[in-house]
Amino acid sequence: MKHFLEISQLSSEQIESLLQRALYFKHTKQYPSYSQSIIANLFYENSTRTRISFELAERHLAMSVVNLDLQTSSEIKGEAIEDTIRTLAAMGIQYFVIRHKQDGLQQNLANKLGDTVHIINAGDGTHAHPSQAILDMVTIIEQKKRLDKLKIAILGNIKHSRVANSFQCICSKLGVGDLVLISPEIWQPSQVHFGRVTDNLNEGLEGADVVICLRVQRERLLEDDHLDLDFYRNNFALTQKSLSYAKPDAMVMHPGPMNRGVEIDSEVADGNQSCILQQVTNGVYARMAILESLIAS
């Protein structure tokens, strides 16, 4: 694996290998050392979980880590991102973790620069967030062993969610039994990669084994008069009442950051069924598996 860009570019066998390797790291705490490998983290969008998770993964693997401060870099002077990467590669940096608001940017960089560097997609616009899909599936298979028997519900702004896009792809690759995308009509995707769409919250949650709640992007609500926060809260929030339609042992997940009292209530986020912090923990091990796969190949 030369780059890690999209779930759709991986085989089911590659995905299974990443999942099992992540669990191996978690349970054994036995980590290989890649002290000769140098990696740079370039985050052109704000991030807490993904950025720190990748950095911890890199340090667990004994990689040399460079965190580029974009506020003091030549990007402020107008330098193109491909020139930044070429410059860093000339200094000996081989691996680049990149988050950017532009859809497809990491794929374009891989096409232009792929002979000399390895690109890891840490999120591109509304397009893809493949490492989130891996860590989410690691979290699920820890508790639910038969993916083909599961009903998974993902709730929120599906249309603009890179998390939802990548998760649909990984469910398709691994043969998840039933994936339901729950969203108000205006947030429903124009293209469904896998699963079925509904705007009926209770119907979508009925009998679900896993419920994934997405963040409501308040900045997008303010820009669009058609989106009403109170309407969303009243009809699509994950509350104790709405969660009761899912199975009693249903897992509750959220990629973060959460808007408590908007898309999810605190008693759900902090309740016995919540696996949100488990996702954060597994994110480090999932990203270790991804990085190792790139280095080893």
From Swiss-Prot:
Keyword Transferase set for record: yes
InterPro entries: Asp/Orn_carbamoyltranf_P-bd (IPR006132), Asp/Orn_carbamoylTrfase (IPR006130), Asp/Orn_carbamoylTrfase_sf (IPR036901), Asp_carbamoyltransf (IPR002082), Asp_carbamoyltransf_Asp/Orn-bd (IPR006131)
Keyword annotations of the record: Pyrimidine biosynthesis, Transferase
This enzyme's EC code(s): 2.1.3.2
Record-level GO BP terms: 'de novo' pyrimidine nucleobase biosynthetic process; 'de novo' UMP biosynthetic process; amino acid metabolic process
An annotated GO cellular component: cytosol
GO molecular function terms attached to this record: amino acid binding; aspartate carbamoyltransferase activity
Residue positions binding carbamoyl phosphate: 49-50, 99, 129, 132, 256-257
Pathway: Pyrimidine metabolism; UMP biosynthesis via de novo pathway; (S)-dihydroorotate from bicarbonate: step 2/3
Leading EC class: transferase
Residues annotated as binding L-aspartate: 77, 162, 215
Superkingdom to which the source organism belongs: Bacteria
Gene3D superfamilies: Aspartate/ornithine carbamoyltransferase
Reactions catalysed, as given in the entry: carbamoyl phosphate + L-aspartate = N-carbamoyl-L-aspartate + phosphate + H(+)
Signal peptide: none
Function in brief: Catalyzes the condensation of carbamoyl phosphate and aspartate to form carbamoyl aspartate and inorganic phosphate, the committed step in the de novo pyrimidine nucleotide biosynthesis pathway.
Subunit structure, as described in the record: Heterododecamer (2C3:3R2) of six catalytic PyrB chains organized as two trimers (C3), and six regulatory PyrI chains organized as three dimers (R2).
Family per similarity comment: Belongs to the aspartate/ornithine carbamoyltransferase superfamily. ATCase family.
PANTHER family, per database record: ASPARTATE CARBAMOYLTRANSFERASE (PTHR45753:SF6), ORNITHINE CARBAMOYLTRANSFERASE, MITOCHONDRIAL (PTHR45753)
Listed name of the protein: Aspartate carbamoyltransferase catalytic subunit
Organism of provenance: Legionella pneumophila (strain Paris)
